[in-house]
């Protein structure tokens, strides 16, 4: 290379034009750019020697302007068509002759720039450039089009994000939803999310940190999620929505109900007065009760259970969907149903004043509460009253002469409870609460009283479960029996030391084994029954629905739809789903409890020390009596079981699942 040679070199990846000035050592050259800046560069930094005479640094601006006149990337396509036909490569000088019919320095450098920046038509081999095949060019064009389209989509997405962050309403495109769903998965599942890299790329491109917390914050700012989004639910496999196919099947079922297999066997019980008793907010009404006066002076109790299997067949679309869900999930913000809403609250429910299909349990009791005789029937009923628990409590308190049946049913429920206690039933009376969150995210926690109406319903449902179990056991029908091993309770003298009420009940409760499901009957210790199944919530629990399928098939003399092994497999699968649903319910309730307490941090709560969790660490369980909520707390001083404390929330963060209390200490004024 000689002094005055015009060349291109690279500095930090950028193209620079300079003129060779002098050698620097054995290999390097000092070059000077148009601004007079001198740099010593090794040969490897020199990208292209333009040549064409002796140049001065001041010539560079005019040279660059001259080159720019020839920089038309579209001209390469014409050259490529010629060269691919001839199957030959070119260097920049030859390309200059082909494109511009001359090989002067500006033409040559323009050709070099076009070739070196081209990613479509040519590939470099040494100092020459070979034409790609037509197939390769077509594929690269397709890739470029895809990338251009992707960049356009990204630009549009960013624009919509900025609009939404500014408070404007936007309509998300399908491609936007893919990005948003990736953010949702990442916010909920963190590094376990398969979409995490996609989400991180989106966050980084928007100038945000690529953490799950940042994804959550962005979703809240975009109003895609609430500040109180249920991450516990989103981390599970619980399906929140029904598929289009299931909804279509549900609608067909509503419009064109299938033939009733039990039409000829349904007992007409529309003459009976039927009471359905639920919370005011309950929409899936799956049980009702009646009392019938017999000619011999005895009274017959009827427990009517909704008959959703009237609309289903084992293994059909709706049945399999219900089996997959296994249970309705009840959350403070609403429920995730087992069946589509219109079906569950419509023809499946026991709706007031409408003809309803039911599975009715008839029973005559001894004065002691023991079962004298019973029968089970598919039936048609017409619910008379849709009552709340408060309604029934008021009716019982007033002793309405117009409704003697409800008082009689309540009296029988007390006898039933006494009989179960005589059979070894274990009564645990602990405060319970209802937690509701409305559409404005206002939280209400209501203490549920252990009132006569709730006792009435509970005893009637337990009675139906006993009758269903007796029938299945007598006729060798495989159903999901529920059992509970006998607990080892603390000695009587140890229990008597504890304060009566929640403290004593808590000591008993901690000794109770979990109930178990199996296809063979076993004793249920806490209920005091030798055999028991759940049959009273077939709209909300798949185990109940399964029992209905089996019992109804036997009643009409058909083969059982499910053999023992099939029932066992289903019991195992729904058991896992129910445990997951229970965990979601518990953790979601806890979240809203902590949020409620955070919002009421100025209030003083009366608490009782229930039991020790780790006494050596002063960690125990407390009960906030006003709202019936149990929480763990590490006591800052020595306390005893049953002690009452006045507490105030010192710190609460429901998202981090943390709450700390401080005890209020009152000083007595000295006279």
Annotated model-derived regions:
Residues 40, 49-62:
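Compositionally biased alpha-helical segments
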Residues 112-113, 117-152, 194, 228-232:
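Charged low-complexity interaction tracts in eukaryotic proteins
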Residues 2-6, 10-16, 24-27, 35-37, ...:
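Electropositive polyanion-binding surfaces
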């Amino acid at each position: 290379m000689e002094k005055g040679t015009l060349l291109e070199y690279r500095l930090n990846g950028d193209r620079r034009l300079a003129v060779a000035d002098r050698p620097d050592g054995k290999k390097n050259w000092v070059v000077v750019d148009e601004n007079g800046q001198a740099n010593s560069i090794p040969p490897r930094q020199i990208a292209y020697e333009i040549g064409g005479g002796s140049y001065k640094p001041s010539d560079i601006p005019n040279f660059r302007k001259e080159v720019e006149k020839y920089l038309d990337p579209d001209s390469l396509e014409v050259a490529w068509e010629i060269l691919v036909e001839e199957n030959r490569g070119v260097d920049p000088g030859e390309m200059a002759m082909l494109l511009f019919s001359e090989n002067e320095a500006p033409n040559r450098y323009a050709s070099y720039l076009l070739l070196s920046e081209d990613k479509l038509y040519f590939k470099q081999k040494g100092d020459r450039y070979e034409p790609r095949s037509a197939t390769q060019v077509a594929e690269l064009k397709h890739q470029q089009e895809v990338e251009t389209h992707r960049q356009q989509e990204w630009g549009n997405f960013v624009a919509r994000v900025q609009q939404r962050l500014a408070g404007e309403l936007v309509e998300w495109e399908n491609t936007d939803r893919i990005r948003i769903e990736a953010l949702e998965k990442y916010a909920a599942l963190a590094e376990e999310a398969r979409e995490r890299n996609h989400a991180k790329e989106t966050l980084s491109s928007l100038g945000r940190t690529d953490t799950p917390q940042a994804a959550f914050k962005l979703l809240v700012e975009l109003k895609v999620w609430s500040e109180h989004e249920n991450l516990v639910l989103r981390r599970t496999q619980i399906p929140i929505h029904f598929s289009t196919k299931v909804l279509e099947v549900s609608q067909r079922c509503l419009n064109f109900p299938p033939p009733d297999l039990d039409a000829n066997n349904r007992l007409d019980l529309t003459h009976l007065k039927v009471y359905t008793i639920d919370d005011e907010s309950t929409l899936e009404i799956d049980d009702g009760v009646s009392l019938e006066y017999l000619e011999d002076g005895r009274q017959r109790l009827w427990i009517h259970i909704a008959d959703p299997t009237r609309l289903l067949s084992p293994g059909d679309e709706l049945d399999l969907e219900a089996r997959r869900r296994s249970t309705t999930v009840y959350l403070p913000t609403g429920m995730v149903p087992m069946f589509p809403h219109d079906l569950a609250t419509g023809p499946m429910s026991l709706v007031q004043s409408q003809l309803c299909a039911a599975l009715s349990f008839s029973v005559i009791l001894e004065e002691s509460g023991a079962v004298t005789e019973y029968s089970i029937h598919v039936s048609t009923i017409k619910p008379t009253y849709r009552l709340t628990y408060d309604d029934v409590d008021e009716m019982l308190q007033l002793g309405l002469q117009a409704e003697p049946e409800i008082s009689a049913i309540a009296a029988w429920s007390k006898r039933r409870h006494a009989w179960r206690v005589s059979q070894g039933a274990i009564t645990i009376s602990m405060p319970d609460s209802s937690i509701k969150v409305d559409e404005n995210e206002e939280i209400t926690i209501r203490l549920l009283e252990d009132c006569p109406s709730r006792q009435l319903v509970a005893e009637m449902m337990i009675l139906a479960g006993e009758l269903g179990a007796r029938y299945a056991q007598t006729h060798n029908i495989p159903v999901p029996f529920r059992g509970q091993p006998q607990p080892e309770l603390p000695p009587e003298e140890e229990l008597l030391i504890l304060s009566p009420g929640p403290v004593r009940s808590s000591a008993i409760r901690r000794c109770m084994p979990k109930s178990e499901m199996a296809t063979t009957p076993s004793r249920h210790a806490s209920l005091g029954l030798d055999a028991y199944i759940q049959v009273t919530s077939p709209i909300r629990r798949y185990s109940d629905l399964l029992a209905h399928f089996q019992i109804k098939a036997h009643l009409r003399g058909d083969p059982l739809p499910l053999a023992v092994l099939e029932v066992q497999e289903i019991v195992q699968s729904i058991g896992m789903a129910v445990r997951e649903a229970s965990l979601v319910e518990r953790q979601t309730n806890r979240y809203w409890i902590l949020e409620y307490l955070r919002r009421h941090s100025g209030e003083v709560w009366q608490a009782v020390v229930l039991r020790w969790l780790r006494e050596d660490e002063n960690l125990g369980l407390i009960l906030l009596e006003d709202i019936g909520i149990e929480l763990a707390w590490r006591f800052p001083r020595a306390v005893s079981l049953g002690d009452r404390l006045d507490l105030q929330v010192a710190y609460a963060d429901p998202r981090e699942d943390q709450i700390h209390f401080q005890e209020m200490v009152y000083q007595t004024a000295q006279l």
